[in-house]
Amino acid sequence: MKEKFELVSAYDPAGDQPNAINEITKKVLAGQRHQTLLGATGTGKTFTMSNVVKEINRPTLVIAHNKTLAGQLYSEFKEFFPNNAVEYFVSYYDYYQPEAYVPSTDTFIEKDASINDEIDKLRHSATSALFERQDVLIVASVSCIYGLGNPEEYKSQVLSLRMGMEKDRDQLLRDLVEVQYARNDINFQRGTFRVRGDSVEIIPASHEEYCIRVEFFGDEIDRIREVDALTGEIIGDREHVAIFPASHFVTREEKMKIAIQNIEKELEEQLKEMRDNGKLLEAQRLEQRTNYDLEMMREMGFCSGIENYSRHLTLRGPGAVPYTLLDFFPEDFLVIIDESHVTLPQIRGMFNGDQARKQVLVDHGFRLPSAMDNRPLRFQEFEDKTKQLVYVSATPGPYELEHSPEMTEQIIRPTGLLDPKVEVRPIEGQIDNLIEEIRIRMEKNERVLITTLTKKMSEDLTDYLKEIGMKVAYLHSEIKTLERIEVIRDLRVGKFDVLVGINLLREGLDIPEVSLVSILDADKEGFLRSERSLIQTMGRAARNENGKVIMYADKMTDSMKKAIDETNRRRTIQTEYNEQHGITPKTIRKEVRDVIKATTAAEETESYEPKTKQINKMTKKEREKVIEQMENEMKQAAKDLDFEKAAELRDVILELKAEG
């Protein structure tokens, strides 16, 4: 029987959510290829999409434009679908420095990466879930368009073990090694197996909490048990178990032999061409590097950077489309693209950036030309591999507008909150006028965001406001992650009343205490004053019942007019709905989350103090202790699936290491 998505939620769809759910569901079931959910900030878009997934009941891929957002979505979907396979698939590098070559200085930068074991486990959990069940929802970052092994090869190498099956114990051990499990009787961890008399214990690549114990009687599997990997407690008996490969790049021995021959052939041709063109140094470099890799592949079955030979390992021709996570899904899967106005351009840009870097490596003898085929998908290829897409955004981009002119709107917030009122005021006397407005907000214990166009303007304004005794902070691009989190927290708890910045579009700035957003130089056309950016910036005041936006401008630009008209249109719809249903808007009360405990010193002080200053005074030894403590906290956060906290910690650790 086909498993069903089971939505668990304390509340029912409200406002225009029911209409949006019905409309999108109907269009998907009718086979419409593209559609867009135009959802204003704070209208519960994730809840709407969860309802659509439940109604359609197909495997679903949700793509977000960065790990933090993917982590937030993953947590939300997991809450809505606790009994289904909600998975997380992002790049497993904690940090990643791709190999590169700078010809001008003759500098080769080796690939340097730290792989997060927890995320690697979740990636395996995602791919294996797709082969085991139907009710799968995977939240991914754009890394899902990067090369992965051949899904057919991956599937064909799954070890299927049943009770009563005839199988020789030693044959099982050989099979496990072939799918890249390592025997380790001492350090028993994910992706390893150990042998104890007549039983073999395996920890699958997609889990580490439990291991599978296969007990033999002669040449027959007598019993299969699930055992707690830590305590050895028996969880239960299994009739059947599927052991998925420990790597996504699995290649059978016979295929590996053909691949090695093809690599040798390509190497020969490339060396000849290089020598004919007088590139002797490059030829020597290429020969040495490739032969070393080939030797490793013959002996070990893999080498460092094996993904650069993926075209040969999957026996594809030059220029062929790489296999990606999309190929692991069944034919009828649904794709949801979150914040599509940012995510789609990102997908479009991946291929060109990757090729430019690799071309330099090939030209200078660091890689064979076939390495160019270990690449992300081109946008056209991405379109070919996806059959039905739903774009979700408060400000859809040109691609969405072109492909789905009839959008599904979701404008009413379940809280009854309205889009802010918008006023345009002249630039002359803007600062005095702004100060008056700030004072009104301070009396009501509300906060103000001010966005300027230049760094100098931000600094001057911050200094001036400080001089006249206002509590103000300046959020600029050089500010470190930890400080940024602290500044936002300080604004919320009232340490500051005003926050000045240039780009207020980054995540984390949805602050319910903010009742005024002031946009200086609103009539200067450009990226941060485009229609889309203005609507997003204005949305920062939409979480407060007294939300208001003041634009300072001497003329009305086209972008301003469109943004104001759209906001007023939404506000009218929201007001009418509230009047009809007797709803009074109420500001969202959101608790102030504690900043990550960065230092033991900070934990001991009851009053809230900026931790960064304390860190600066530390000795090297104390700093190392803090980093170690934070790394443990980061790993724990990743284990608890709080990826937002883990990402914040990771950034802070990198900054501390750089300063140390």
From Swiss-Prot:
SUPFAM superfamilies: C-terminal UvrC-binding domain of UvrB (SSF46600), P-loop containing nucleoside triphosphate hydrolases (SSF52540)
Residues binding ATP, per UniProt: G39, A40, T41, G42, T43, G44, K45, T46
Residue numbers covered by motif Beta-hairpin: 92-115
Keyword terms of this UniProt record: ATP-binding, Cytoplasm, DNA damage, DNA excision, DNA repair, Excision nuclease, Nucleotide-binding, SOS response
Location of this chain's protein in the cell: Cytoplasm
One of the GO BP terms on file: SOS response
Helicase ATP-binding domain sequence ranges: 26-414
Gene Ontology molecular function, alphabetical: ATP binding; ATP hydrolysis activity; DNA binding; excinuclease ABC activity
S-S bonds: none
Major subcellular site: cytoplasm
GO cellular component, one term: cytoplasm
Domain Helicase C-terminal: from-to ranges: 430-596
Domain UVR: start-end pairs: 624-659
Pfam families from the UniProt entry: Helicase_C, ResIII, UVR, UvrB, UvrB_inter
InterPro entries per UniProt: Helicase/UvrB_N, Helicase_ATP-bd, Helicase_C-like, P-loop_NTPase, UVR_dom, UVR_dom_sf, UvrB, UvrB_inter
HAMAP family: UvrB
Described function: The UvrABC repair system catalyzes the recognition and processing of DNA lesions. A damage recognition complex composed of 2 UvrA and 2 UvrB subunits scans DNA for abnormalities. Upon binding of the UvrA(2)B(2) complex to a putative damaged site, the DNA wraps around one UvrB monomer. DNA wrap is dependent on ATP binding by UvrB and probably causes local melting of the DNA helix, facilitating insertion of UvrB beta-hairpin between the DNA strands. Then UvrB probes one DNA strand for the presence of a lesion.
NCBIfam families, alphabetized: PRK05298.1, uvrb
Family according to the record: Belongs to the UvrB family.
Domain notes: The beta-hairpin motif is involved in DNA binding.
SUBUNIT field: Forms a heterotetramer with UvrA during the search for lesions. Interacts with UvrC in an incision complex.
Protein name as catalogued: UvrABC system protein B
Record organism: Oceanobacillus iheyensis (strain DSM 14371 / CIP 107618 / JCM 11309 / KCTC 3954 / HTE831)
